[in-house]
């Protein structure tokens, strides 16, 4: 799922050695829309998200990120959820997010605590992440992706491990973020 200003793929390709994972893709993702990227397991969806977010370079072609609001350029333009988000298991969920926010100084502890409530983790925000279920880790990853109000959200399988309430919560959050 993608929520953004605009991302344009220009003949974007990604290879690992001789294996072409993504071949010369062109696409334009418009502002205020939610897109779903679907395909078989192993077809390169996660690789595409990593390239679009800047976590992985393309092999050829380019990815253009257009942000209309100059203020957006001053904050992290992209919030990302990639499968297997890395959190410090010895810290609580809240402490993980506060530590990440301390790096950029874009979110304060009060706002993060409110966000933990929004994603349904407030009863467990002081529990160490090592004791979080898969669904709780996914909620934490979503909170981390949106905590600095990014212009673009790239969410790779954001509903993995979520129960019905978690799915509903994520959909509600995406509706708000879209606007």
Predicted regions and their residues:
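Helix-to-loop junction immediately C-terminal to a conserved catalytic motif
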Residues: 53
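Catalytic Walker B motif of ABC-type/P-loop ATPase nucleotide-binding domains
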Residues: 153-157
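Hydrophobic anchor residue at the start of the ABC signature
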Residues: 142
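Conserved ABC ATPase "signature" region
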Residues: 98, 109-124
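Conserved ABC transporter NBD signature motif
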Residues: 61-74
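A short, flexible loop at the N-terminus of ABC-type nucleotide-binding domains that lies
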Residues: 4-31, 59
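The feature captures the beta-strand-to-loop junction immediately N-terminal to the Walker
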Residues: 38-40
């Amino acid at each position: 799922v993608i929520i953004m200003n605009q991302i344009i793929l220009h003949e974007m390709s990604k290879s690992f050695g001789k294996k072409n994972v993504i071949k010369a893709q062109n696409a334009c993702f418009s502002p205020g829309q939610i897109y779903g990227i679907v395909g078989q397991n192993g077809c390169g969806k996660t690789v595409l998200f990593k390239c679009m977010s800047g976590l992985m370079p393309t092999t050829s072609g380019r990815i253009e990120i257009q942000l209309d609001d100059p203020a957006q350029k001053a904050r992290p333009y992209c919030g990302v959820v990639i499968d297997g988000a890395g959190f410090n298991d010895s810290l609580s969920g809240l402490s993980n997010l506060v530590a990440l926010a301390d790096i950029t100084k874009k979110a304060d502890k009060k706002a993060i605590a409110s966000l933990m409530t929004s994603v349904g983790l407030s009863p467990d925000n002081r529990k160490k992440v090592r004791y979080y279920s898969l669904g709780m880790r996914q909620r934490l990853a979503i909170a981390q992706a949106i905590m600095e109000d990014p212009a673009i959200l790239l969410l790779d399988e954001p509903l993995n491990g979520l129960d019905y309430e978690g799915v509903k919560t994520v959909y509600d959050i995406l509706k708000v973020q879209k606007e």
